[in-house]
Amino acid sequence: SPHAFRLNPMEDSIQEVIQATLELSANGELLQFEDVFANHSIHYDITHPYKQLLIKSKSRVKVYSCPPDSHSPIMRRSQIPLMWMPWQRQMMLPYLLPPELPETQLRQLTDLAMSFVKRNDSHLIDSLMDINKKIYEDFSYVQGITFLETTAFDVFSIRKGVCQDFANLFICLCRLIDIPARYRVGYIYTGGDYENKL
């Protein structure tokens, strides 16, 4: 069975990877590559039957000081709209498509997304931070009022939901201003058989 792993931390001007290891309990064929987003990636094809697959990833990184609100001089200023080479756009297309919603709802959400871009002088990071701040400040965390079928527009309208709803709204707004975004689900195993280890 084939598997894809993207577990290595990114290395850039504010983070250095000292060591990164990946241990897999089942034998298979391993191919390492860098994907279009510059992620260190591993394709692992397990060719023999197995009863259990244990994945152990360990990383040690050195993080250099950079205040979270200071995007320069280390981080270059990126402007919206972002410019993509045709092959990059092709690779990112699944992460650029907005959700299937009525046109009137998409227009409202697009207007909202563009309001952040305009008020931040088209600065990429500042616009994204502003969207995040707005969701954090203006939306209430309320369990049990949304479902898997709840759309980004529904969340925008009721201003309530849970983490997944806020993430989906953020992703939708990003895509409407041509910033690739996706939702990933994962977990961290912390060991032990007692509750609330995290």
What is the role of each PLM region?
Residues Y44, Y95, F139-Y141, F166, ...:
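Aromatic side chains
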Residues E11-S13, G28-L30, Y50-Q52, P67, ...:
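A generic structural micro-environment signature
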Residues R76-G161, L169-I171, L176-I177:
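Secondary-structure boundary elements
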Residues S1-L82:
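Intrinsically disordered, low-complexity N-terminal segments that are enriched in acidic
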